[in-house]
Amino acid sequence: MLDERAKLLLKALIERYIADGQPVGSRTLSRASGLELSPATIRNVMADLEDLGLIISPHTSAGRIPTARGYRLFVDTMLTADRADIVTPELVPEQPQKVIANAANLLSSLSQFVGVVLVPRRTSVFKHIEFVRLSERRFLVIIVSPDGDVQNRVIFTDVDYSSSQLIEASNFLNSHYAGLAMEEVRERLKGEVELLRGEVATLMQAAVNIGTEAMTSAQEDVVIAGERNLLSVSDFSSDMGNLRRAFDLFEQKTQILRLLDFSSQAEGVRIYIGGESQVVPFEELSVVSAPYELDGKVVGTLGVIGPTRMHYDRMIQIVDITSKLVSNALSHKR
């Protein structure tokens, strides 16, 4: 258990290191802490903090830097609640894919690190379907999902359907099957085609087949923006090995997906420092994440990935604000 003096010195050391990235010596720490302590006393406290695994001494310097364990104690017990001056533009309610992409870019821009957003799992349930004639025997099928996602597909037919036939087909599908998964609609249609004229039934079956493919097709599971920002972070630009590992992590995405998926089960902002998540075993990276919602239900997670030497208070606010913006934008796109 740390006494108050040790806590103040650890807090001052971490804040100083976050600010300039240089190992902190006893003289610098004496000035930064504001405590009237002799350099010898400060060195003794720093030795105790090192024994506890909260700070370490790089071999190239007599100063100290925080460990992941030190950052964790700092984040859990020492962060101030001062509101940072963060100017965030509104995310305009529009198609979910655009909201997600804009959110990743916003996170990256505000943090100057990497913004990541876990994409909601696409559903094959449809809310509305409509047909538009493009030319002879060529039609546009417009499929709207319950979350406002719009899929447009062009189909070619052997029959040149009239406007009344297109309306008949869309009305039947919307009145009988809206709210069902496309796979279920396809099965039900097989037993109900005799209720409709043959040509219209064929059109509906073609629309449902292409709709099933469109709404369950492979999609990007996670959107990542700002990877190149790490090139400007001294913690990475000076170590090509770490930089290469970080870019491999972003390219493969698997570990990021697992971490964001796990984070969606938590309420509020979560912070993973270094390798403590055991999902992204990277001692030099930290992840600040938060879930976002659609109509009050958690549908995904977003966050910032950057060096362990980050302004955690600012990152927490950026992630928290962005999760609220995304939730509002998605829920208002109804």
Swiss-Prot record:
<comment type="similarity">
    <text>Belongs to the HrcA family.</text>
</comment>
<dbReference type="Pfam" id="PF03444">
    <property type="entry name" value="HrcA_DNA-bdg"/>
</dbReference>
<dbReference type="InterPro" id="IPR029016">
    <property type="entry name" value="GAF-like_dom_sf"/>
</dbReference>
<dbReference type="Pfam" id="PF01628">
    <property type="entry name" value="HrcA"/>
</dbReference>
<comment type="function">
    <text>Negative regulator of class I heat shock genes (grpE-dnaK-dnaJ and groELS operons). Prevents heat-shock induction of these operons.</text>
</comment>
<dbReference type="GO" id="GO:0045892">
    <property type="term" value="P:negative regulation of DNA-templated transcription"/>
</dbReference>
<dbReference type="InterPro" id="IPR036390">
    <property type="entry name" value="WH_DNA-bd_sf"/>
</dbReference>
<dbReference type="GO" id="GO:0003677">
    <property type="term" value="F:DNA binding"/>
</dbReference>
<keyword id="KW-0804">Transcription</keyword>
<dbReference type="InterPro" id="IPR002571">
    <property type="entry name" value="HrcA"/>
</dbReference>
<keyword id="KW-0678">Repressor</keyword>
<dbReference type="InterPro" id="IPR023120">
    <property type="entry name" value="WHTH_transcript_rep_HrcA_IDD"/>
</dbReference>
<dbReference type="InterPro" id="IPR021153">
    <property type="entry name" value="HrcA_C"/>
</dbReference>
<keyword id="KW-0346">Stress response</keyword>
<protein>
    <recommendedName>
        <fullName>Heat-inducible transcription repressor HrcA</fullName>
    </recommendedName>
</protein>
<dbReference type="InterPro" id="IPR036388">
    <property type="entry name" value="WH-like_DNA-bd_sf"/>
</dbReference>
<keyword id="KW-0805">Transcription regulation</keyword>
<dbReference type="InterPro" id="IPR005104">
    <property type="entry name" value="WHTH_HrcA_DNA-bd"/>
</dbReference>
